[in-house]
A protein has these predicted regions:
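Beta-propeller domain segments
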Residues: 4-8, 13-176, 184, 194-198, ...
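Short alpha-helical "switch" segments that flank and position catalytic residues
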Residues: 189
Length: 213
């Protein structure tokens, strides 16, 4: 939920319908925005005084979505095909490129597109190649872990670790791998009341609270 009590929700492009991510008549491959009663709060529709639920488009498989209170921004990560996982800053009406541009290739090794960037396409804040398979995501700007202020935590399923992206003035300054010693798939992360929690998945999955040294 955003501060105005509207809801953002993501949708994938359905694997076999990748071109629909570019279509404004399809809700596949989109970030959608609506009120709690379901009323669309996205882009203008075709009729007068109508709206769609589409907020941004050109997404492949968006998953993590987080609102940054300090700047009122929304960050989103999404899975690329083979390589090309992305972190994006979400803006109303912006095109994020899939499948016209990508930093990855198809699972067969063939090109999805020969282009990594194009005019009119919003470029990602950060990319991961090879893929890390990003999972849960959480923003931290508290006082309990002062060295981690202004950091985005992203679960990395493939690497079985957490990636910390350090931000300064809205730009990623560096990336750090954490908690690899757990050797567990990181499914989700949450920040609550200045506390950081990690959820792992498996038959022995755990909910772990991170404690200061």
């Amino acid at each position: 939920f955003l501060p105005d009590e509207t809801l953002l929700m993501t949708s994938g492009e359905g694997f076999e319908h990748r071109e629909d991510a570019q279509s404004l008549t399809s809700e596949l491959g989109k970030v959608l925005r609506f009120d709690v009663d379901g009323k669309p709060r996205g882009l203008a529709g075709k009729g007068p005084n109508t709206r769609t639920r589409i907020w941004s488009y050109g997404h492949r498989n968006p998953q993590g979505l987080v609102h940054i209170p300090e700047t009122d921004e929304v960050l989103l990560h999404e899975h690329g095909p083979r390589g090309g996982d992305e972190l994006n800053r979400v803006f109303r009406g912006e095109n994020y490129g899939w499948p016209l541009v990508t930093y990855g290739v198809d699972y067969s090794g063939a090109y999805v597109s020969p282009f990594q960037r194009a005019e009119g396409i919003r470029e990602p804040l950060w990319t991961w190649t090879p893929s890390i398979a990003p999972s849960g995501m959480a923003w931290y700007n508290g006082s309990r872990f002062p060295a981690w202020r202004s950091s985005l935590f992203v679960g990395a399923l493939v690497n079985r670790e957490v990636r910390r992206l350090e931000f300064r003035n809205g730009v990623v300054q560096r990336e750090e791998a954490l908690f690899a010693e757990l050797d567990e798939r990181i499914r989700d992360l949450r920040v609550f009341d200045d506390r950081i929690f990690i959820l792992t998945d498996s038959e022995l999955g755990r909910l772990i609270e991170v404690l200061p040294h």
